[in-house]
Amino acid sequence: MRRFALTVALPKGRMFREAYEVLKRAGLDLPEVEGERTLLHGKEGGVALLELRNKDVPIYVDLGIAEIGVVGKDVLLDSGRDLFEPVDLGFGACRLSLIRRPGDTGPIRRVATKYPNFTARLLKERGWAADVVELSGNIELAAVTGLADAVVDVVQTGATLRAAGLVEVEVLAHSTARLVVNRQALKLKRAVLKPLIQRLRELSGS
């Protein structure tokens, strides 16, 4: 198995490029991305880059496979992982919202979401006796078809909701991209991570 000076976990998709560029600007010598089928980028002794699904980034960082990662706050709210979160990077802004069909005011008995842990906590805090249905595809469809009385999902512009004929009832949390750091790595690789964190704070204005 190859050994690296530092391993970075980044989410695939729209957040990847911005995360990659901001880490480069902060002075991290990231490897070039060689192709979509490459699971691990980097040369032995250098910086390695893992391209992961959003929900997998906190897991890889928490378990020490990667020392640092970038992921949305929405994912962190659902993950339950004990990670150091030193920098709000500011991009990838969205919100987690409660969504229903127009005019629906009845009790919520079933909620569909990609964020089951966050949603379960919300229901418990509010004393709502509702079931949580975890889905991975088009969450809005669950409300449109009546599979669920409400959905908890990410909203950016609201265009998707309007197109589906749904309404945003309540904003539950705001989300942006965050730098996350493995707590043990923060101690063991302090000489590398401390200046990187400081530079990212300067770049993000946080």
From Swiss-Prot:
Enzyme Commission number(s) from the entry: 2.4.2.17
CDD domains: PBP2_HisGs
Reactions listed under catalytic activity: 1-(5-phospho-beta-D-ribosyl)-ATP + diphosphate = 5-phospho-alpha-D-ribose 1-diphosphate + ATP
Cellular localization per UniProt: Cytoplasm
Pfam families: HisG
Segments traversing the membrane: none
Pathway field: Amino-acid biosynthesis; L-histidine biosynthesis; L-histidine from 5-phospho-alpha-D-ribose 1-diphosphate: step 1/9
MF (Gene Ontology): ATP binding; ATP phosphoribosyltransferase activity
Gene Ontology BP terms: L-histidine biosynthetic process
UniProt GO cellular component terms: cytoplasm
Description of how the protein assembles with itself and partners: Heteromultimer composed of HisG and HisZ subunits.
Annotated family: Belongs to the ATP phosphoribosyltransferase family. Short subfamily.
Record remark: domains: Lacks the C-terminal regulatory region which is replaced by HisZ.
Function text: Catalyzes the condensation of ATP and 5-phosphoribose 1-diphosphate to form N'-(5'-phosphoribosyl)-ATP (PR-ATP). Has a crucial role in the pathway because the rate of histidine biosynthesis seems to be controlled primarily by regulation of HisG enzymatic activity.
Record-linked PANTHER family: ATP PHOSPHORIBOSYLTRANSFERASE, ATP PHOSPHORIBOSYLTRANSFERASE ATP-PRTASE
The protein's name: ATP phosphoribosyltransferase
Organism: Thermus thermophilus (strain ATCC BAA-163 / DSM 7039 / HB27)
The organism's taxonomic lineage, starting at the top: Bacteria, Thermotogati, Deinococcota, Deinococci, Thermales
